[in-house]
Amino acid sequence: MTPSSPAGDLIPLLVAVVAIGLVPFIAMMVTSYTKIVIVLGLLRNALGVQQVPPNMVLNGIAIIISVYIMAPVGMTAMDTVKEKGLAGGNVAQLGQMVEAVAEPVREFLLKHAEHRERNFFLKSAAAVWPQERAKQLRDDDLIVLAPAFTLSELSKAFRIGFLIYIAFVVVDLVVA
């Protein structure tokens, strides 16, 4: 063994550990989890109960509903991986597997991200990024779709929460 061999083995392991650590964050940002947990939290506040149900229950409900919503995307991704015969045994196959899984996720994000938010992130990239990189950017790139989707979900969640609050305010006024 050469002295450089352990470092060569360490880098892919380090990349894998970092990628595994980012999976929960990515899962929250590219699913409806954020919207669901915000709506449930606002509903709890509108009811006037601060601790019932507990946050763990709200998060559990949000996870279950998010898995239900994302099931077709997951099924499509698994079918694509099976069709291509990818097992993820080496780094090249792992990269191909990520690309195969990213396509159904991209379609989901494109369907649910508002056009206004996608344009906002394209314009922001043009203002902040180097010009040659910003010109290559399209509105269906994951780097644009993920934050646009998250912002769209937040907007929808607060609109839903506002409607819930209005309903409870009307009930309070009628009862008073």
Name each model-derived stretch.
Residues 1-176:
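Hydrophobic alpha-helical segments and their helix-loop boundaries in membrane
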